[in-house]
């Protein structure tokens, strides 16, 4: 049985991964941690999330003694923390010999030049960054199994890349256009005016400047036009993607490309049928639906996931299972 420490357990993603690990008979939770300055330190997790009343663990402050205890007792650490916090914590635990599963964006780019623009900091851990692998579970399982530094993908990139990677060989130079809508849990647990009950509404944000755009482009190997939207629902993502395929591409080619997921238990693919968010909420699944126009060679593919599950916590759990080979 592997022991896992969870840092940032008070947030939506941290609480979700706590629930998944708690239910996994092959894993045990070494401890749940929050910042020393957190107002939630010392509280039982169930005080914040009554639905987790079966998890009798409290949130401990991540002091220096706690960090050393993690090194002594845990096999791996899950970081559900802010990018700038994960930057340092991931490197520290990695250098102490633990396997790190980082849910932030601090290790998703291999190029250090990307970080000042997209994350607002200079990346000072090139040695750790060079060992990091991108944890897109269905595509990078061999790397996840062998690495001790796993950067779990963002929610929008997970939905988009799962849809686009199978057809990469058929893409033209035209940029895929990705329009995606996420539930408000994607904005985090802290109170914000634009996510409050009376203010939240369907609206685009981060237009031509969202940090998930270069993440998608890097992993796809092609630039994309990505426009995220905030939806007035709690959780889930629906990404609708329009791409033009090469002139010689056929409907049979597309069907054959998506057959790569035939043995992927969490991915469902349907032709001429499109997914809805309600079918994937509270599950680790991704539902894909596609339609191809043989005259224009345009393909429209829709991808639905739960942003807190397949877009974060359950994909981290997948990576843990892949890494520890069970």
UniProtKB/Swiss-Prot annotation:
One GO molecular-function entry: NADP+ binding
Catalysed reactions, semicolon-separated: N-acetyl-L-glutamate 5-semialdehyde + phosphate + NADP(+) = N-acetyl-L-glutamyl 5-phosphate + NADPH + H(+)
Keywords: Amino-acid biosynthesis, Arginine biosynthesis, Cytoplasm, NADP, Oxidoreductase
Cystine pairings recorded for this chain: none
Entry GO terms, CC: cytoplasm
EC number(s) given by UniProt: 1.2.1.38
Matches recorded under PANTHER family: N-ACETYL-GAMMA-GLUTAMYL-PHOSPHATE REDUCTASE, CHLOROPLASTIC-RELATED, N-ACETYL-GAMMA-GLUTAMYL-PHOSPHATE REDUCTASE, CHLOROPLASTIC-RELATED-RELATED
NCBIfam families, A to Z: argC
Protein name (record): N-acetyl-gamma-glutamyl-phosphate reductase
Organism: Shewanella sediminis (strain HAW-EB3)
């Amino acid at each position: 049985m592997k022991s896992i420490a969870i840092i940032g357990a008070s947030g939506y993603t941290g609480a979700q991964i706590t629930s998944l690990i708690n239910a996994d008979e092959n894993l045990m939770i070494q401890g749940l941690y929050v910042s020393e300055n957190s107002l939630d330190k010392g509280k039982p997790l169930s005080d914040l999330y009554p639905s987790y009343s079966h998890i009798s663990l409290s949130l401990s402050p991540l002091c220096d003694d706690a960090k050393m205890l993690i090194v002594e007792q845990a096999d791996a650490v899950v970081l559900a923390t802010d990018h700038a916090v994960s930057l340092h914590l991931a490197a520290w635990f990695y250098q102490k010999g633990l396997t790190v599963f980082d849910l932030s964006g601090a290790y998703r780019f291999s190029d250090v030049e990307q970080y000042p623009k997209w994350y607002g900091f200079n990346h000072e851990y090139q040695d750790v960054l060079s060992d990091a692998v991108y944890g897109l579970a269905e595509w990078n399982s061999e790397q996840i199994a062998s690495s001790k530094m796993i950067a779990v993908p963002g929610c929008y990139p997970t939905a988009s890349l799962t849809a686009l990677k199978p057809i990469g060989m058929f893409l033209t130079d035209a940029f895929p256009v990705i329009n995606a809508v996420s539930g408000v849990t994607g904005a985090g647990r802290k109170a914000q005016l634009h996510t409050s009950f009376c203010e939240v509404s369907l609206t685009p944000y981060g237009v031509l400047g969202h940090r998930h755009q270069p993440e998608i482009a890097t992993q796809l190997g092609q630039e994309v036009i990505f426009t995220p939207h905030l939806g007035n629902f709690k959780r889930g993502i629906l990404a609708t993607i329009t791409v033009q395929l090469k002139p010689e591409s056929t409907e049979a080619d597309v069907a054959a490309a998506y057959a790569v997921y035939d043995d992927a238990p969490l991915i469902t693919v349907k032709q001429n049928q499109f997914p809805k968010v309600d079918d994937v909420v509270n599950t680790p699944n991704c539902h894909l639906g596609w339609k191809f126009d043989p005259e224009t060679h345009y393909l429209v593919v829709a991808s639905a996931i739960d942003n807190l599950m397949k877009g974060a916590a359950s994909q981290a759990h997948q990576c843990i299972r892949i890494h520890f080979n069970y």
